C-alpha cells in the first residue's frame, strides 16, 4: 500500500487492495479510509474517480471514466473525453460490476454483481442489471438481530490478521 500512496491522488488509512490492480494514471484516483478492493480492480482514471469511506468492492470491478465518440473521424483522430465517477460512503459493489463515467453512487448503496452502472444511483438504494436498475430502497434503520454469524473473538482474530497483512505491506 505504501507504493500506491506515492502514485494515487489520495489513499485513506486502512484501505486494502488485493493485487492485481490497474490504474490509467493513478493521480486522478482518490480513495477514502477503511475501503476494500478485491482482486482485478481496474481504474481508468482519465477523469477523477473519488471513492468515499467504508466502500467494499468485489473482484473484477471496473471504474471507467473515458468516453469515446461515435463519429468515425473523431475516433480516427484518437479523440478521448472523460467524465468523473463519485462513490459515496458505505457503498458495496458486487463482483464484476462496471461503473461508467459521469456516475455518482449515493451513500449506503448496493450495486449487484455484474451490473453496468450507466446512471446515478440514489443513496440507500440497491441496483442490479445491465443497465443497472433500482431493485429497492434500503431502510438504514432496518438491521437483522444478528448482523453476522461470527463471535466477537472470531471478529477480533480477523481484524488482527488484516492488521498484520497491512503491516507487512500486502
Model-derived features: where do they sit?
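Glycine-centered loop/turn positions within well-structured domains
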Residues: 49, 123-125, 133
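LRR N-terminal entry segment and analogous cap-like coil->beta motifs
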Residues: 13-18, 37
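Flexible, glycine/small-residue-enriched loop-and-beta-strand segment within the central core
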Residues: 21-31, 36-104, 137-139, 143-145
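Extended beta-solenoid/beta-helix repeat architectures
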Residues: 104-106, 121
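A generic "structured core" feature
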Residues: 88, 92, 110-112, 116
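Terminal amphipathic alpha-helical/low-complexity segments used for targeting or macromolecular assembly
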Residues: 1-14, 132-136, 140-170
Amino acid at each position: 500500500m505504501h507504493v500506491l500512496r506515492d502514485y494515487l491522488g489520495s489513499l485513506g488509512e486502512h484501505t486494502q487492495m488485493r493485487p492485481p490492480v490497474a490504474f490509467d494514471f493513478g493521480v486522478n484516483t482518490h480513495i477514502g479510509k477503511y475501503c476494500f478492493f478485491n482482486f482485478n480492480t481496474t481504474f481508468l482514471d482519465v477523469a477523477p474517480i473519488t471513492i468515499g469511506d467504508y466502500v467494499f468492492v468485489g473482484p473484477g470491478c471496473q471504474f471507467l471514466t473515458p468516453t469515446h465518440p461515435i463519429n468515425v473521424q473523431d475516433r480516427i483522430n484518437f479523440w478521448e473525453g472523460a467524465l468523473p465517477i463519485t462513490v459515496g460512503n458505505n457503498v458495496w459493489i458486487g463482483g464484476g460490476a462496471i461503473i461508467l463515467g459521469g456516475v455518482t453512487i449515493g451513500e449506503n448503496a448496493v450495486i449487484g454483481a455484474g451490473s453496468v452502472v450507466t446512471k446515478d444511483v440514489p443513496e440507500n438504494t440497491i441496483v442490479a442489471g445491465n443497465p443497472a436498475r433500482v431493485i429497492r430502497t434500503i431502510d438504514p434503520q432496518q438491521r437483522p438481530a444478528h448482523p453476522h454469524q461470527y463471535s466477537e473473538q472470531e471478529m477480533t482474530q480477523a481484524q488482527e490478521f488484516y492488521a498484520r497483512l497491512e503491516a507487512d505491506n500486502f
